[in-house]
């Protein structure tokens, strides 16, 4: 049965997903593509070269470390499990977003407003739910515009630091 997280638990469960989503950019485009360079039925890449096994592992690992810190700081072990699930969900949601962008004919780095900002967040929320954790509805709704703004600001910063070729 699903367990409703308190507002604080909800926030602390979502933060690892934010960390997981931002971590792969630190690899600066190095890695083995998850899709192996394969193309889908439409002739376009399944995910594209930007989604790598190394990036996936880095994101999940980074988010898991943040989850461990949150669980340790609050003496609440369920935050570790929730944070790990949120991190995995964030990475899977981001990959689904890349799959959708390729189907729409959008190249790597092309902007897709809202999809770019909310694919990983939706994936994190769904993974938490699938694992039996329900993010407090007020937090889920309040965090949506925050996630959009944070995504934009962190991507602009990554672009200025030359970690990303585009600021979106």
Curated annotation (Swiss-Prot):
<keyword id="KW-0460">Magnesium</keyword>
<keyword id="KW-0443">Lipid metabolism</keyword>
<feature type="transmembrane region" description="Helical">
    <location>
        <begin position="55"/>
        <end position="75"/>
    </location>
</feature>
<comment type="function">
    <text>Catalyzes the formation of CDP-2,3-bis-(O-geranylgeranyl)-sn-glycerol (CDP-archaeol) from 2,3-bis-(O-geranylgeranyl)-sn-glycerol 1-phosphate (DGGGP) and CTP. This reaction is the third ether-bond-formation step in the biosynthesis of archaeal membrane lipids.</text>
</comment>
<dbReference type="InterPro" id="IPR002726">
    <property type="entry name" value="CarS_archaea"/>
</dbReference>
<comment type="similarity">
    <text>Belongs to the CDP-archaeol synthase family.</text>
</comment>
<keyword id="KW-0812">Transmembrane</keyword>
<keyword id="KW-0444">Lipid biosynthesis</keyword>
<keyword id="KW-1208">Phospholipid metabolism</keyword>
<dbReference type="GO" id="GO:0043338">
    <property type="term" value="F:CDP-2,3-bis-(O-geranylgeranyl)-sn-glycerol synthase activity"/>
</dbReference>
<feature type="transmembrane region" description="Helical">
    <location>
        <begin position="109"/>
        <end position="129"/>
    </location>
</feature>
<dbReference type="Pfam" id="PF01864">
    <property type="entry name" value="CarS-like"/>
</dbReference>
<keyword id="KW-0808">Transferase</keyword>
<comment type="pathway">
    <text>Membrane lipid metabolism; glycerophospholipid metabolism.</text>
</comment>
<keyword id="KW-0594">Phospholipid biosynthesis</keyword>
<keyword id="KW-1003">Cell membrane</keyword>
<dbReference type="InterPro" id="IPR032690">
    <property type="entry name" value="CarS"/>
</dbReference>
<feature type="transmembrane region" description="Helical">
    <location>
        <begin position="7"/>
        <end position="27"/>
    </location>
</feature>
<feature type="transmembrane region" description="Helical">
    <location>
        <begin position="80"/>
        <end position="100"/>
    </location>
</feature>
<feature type="transmembrane region" description="Helical">
    <location>
        <begin position="130"/>
        <end position="150"/>
    </location>
</feature>
<dbReference type="GO" id="GO:0046474">
    <property type="term" value="P:glycerophospholipid biosynthetic process"/>
</dbReference>
<protein>
    <recommendedName>
        <fullName>CDP-archaeol synthase</fullName>
        <ecNumber>2.7.7.67</ecNumber>
    </recommendedName>
</protein>
<keyword id="KW-0472">Membrane</keyword>
<keyword id="KW-1133">Transmembrane helix</keyword>
<dbReference type="GO" id="GO:0005886">
    <property type="term" value="C:plasma membrane"/>
</dbReference>
